[in-house]
Amino acid sequence: LQTGYGPSGLPHIGTFGEVARTSMIVNALKHLTDLPTEIITFSDDMDGLRKVPDNVPQKELLEKNLHKPLTNVPDPFQKFNSFGEHNNEMLKKFLNNFKFKYNFKSSTSLYKSGFFNSSLQVILENYDGIMNIILPTLGKERQKTYSPFLPICPVTGHVLEIPVKNINKEKSIIVFDNNGKDLETSIYDGNCKLQWKVDWAMRWYALDVDFEMYGKDLIESAILSTKIIKLIGKTNPSGFAYELFLDEKGEKISKSKGNGITIDQWLEYASPESLSLYMYQNPKRAKKLYKEIVSKTVDDYLDLIEKAKNQNELQLLMNPVWHVHNSLVPKENMIMSFSMLLNLVETSNADSKELLWKFVKKYKKDISEKDNPIFDNLVGYAITVSYTHLRAHETYV
């Protein structure tokens, strides 16, 4: 099972959503079958940097390195060898914090190491057939310049989107026009990469991918990539198209814009499990993702834990928290809703967990922090939410 990540910007909550949802599918497969399963988290870090993201420092540094592979662009945060590596590490750090099990794959690494070489040769052998699939979907002007292969310019280091003038299948080379001068390059070892739709199909082919989910905006790409992988001799993976996350204004969440709530913000306000629940719910429905939605999701999570106590095995399998907790549903009794807890913070002016617990114990006797770990965490989150939102006159209902 594969998940994809385009590291042109910092990882956002939608990126996490793919891994979380795919992990839930893996968990279900393990209970249903004895098939070996693995999640591949693939980073398209050899893509050229098309534009400077809004939410990074040293924009002028990135401006000077536009069109280079992301792993050849300097890191504006000055922590890693490249911008691509920085964003890859941010993704891995987050996924590791959630204890996801995955196998990280770097496009740059697989191209440059030669891992993709044999698959690239298959693409070259089927060059004409692939062009016949792609060209009818393009405008007349784009048809004149399109090529499945994108050479890396030996002078500028840019990923070149230019037409290929000639191919040599026996020597595994392509010939292209570089500012009026014909240049030839091997398709092997990272000297070029593939255009997106062809690259996606080649990746499925090379990595033997059986399943991949993708955003609604990639449905047309998936259709073409499916035609390509069938052309080159393998079965396409099963797919699932999910609706996109929107910010408060109803705009698509973008890695480069950094709009909507961030991963770190959600985890500041609520538990990882509540975020996983949000990912589970209604994947075919476009959902706004902003700060006020957090408390509602937490309350949904608490309600589902309560319902699980009285459910039989079949009903439990249909309960989202079974998937959120990889079948190990917690048994804790819920003391009050998160919304009620937030209101208690506001009315009591509690400024610490200890003080808020005192008010909670007035509401419900004979309870302790030790016996209620989920609620104890909620008390801490409530204090955080209070000082970042309630004090700013934002209302939770």
Predicted regions span which residues?
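Conserved, well-structured beta-alpha core segment at the onset of a catalytic domain
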Residues: 5-31, 35, 81-105, 248-253, ...
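Active-site cores that bind ATP or allylic diphosphates and position pyrophosphate for catalysis
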Residues: 96, 100-263
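N-terminal catalytic cores of NTP/NDP-binding nucleotidyl/phosphoryl-transfer enzymes
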Residues: 1-57, 199-221
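A glycine-rich helix N-cap at a beta->alpha junction
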Residues: 62-80, 94
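Charged, often glycine-rich, active-site loop that binds/positions anionic groups
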Residues: 47-62, 119-120, 124, 252
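Conserved adenylation A10 loop of the ANL superfamily
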Residues: 12, 157-159, 271, 388
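Catalytic adenosine-cofactor/nucleotide-binding cores of aminoacyl-tRNA synthetases and other
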Residues: 217, 243-385
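Single conserved hydrophobic/aromatic residue that forms the stacking wall/gate
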Residues: 389-397
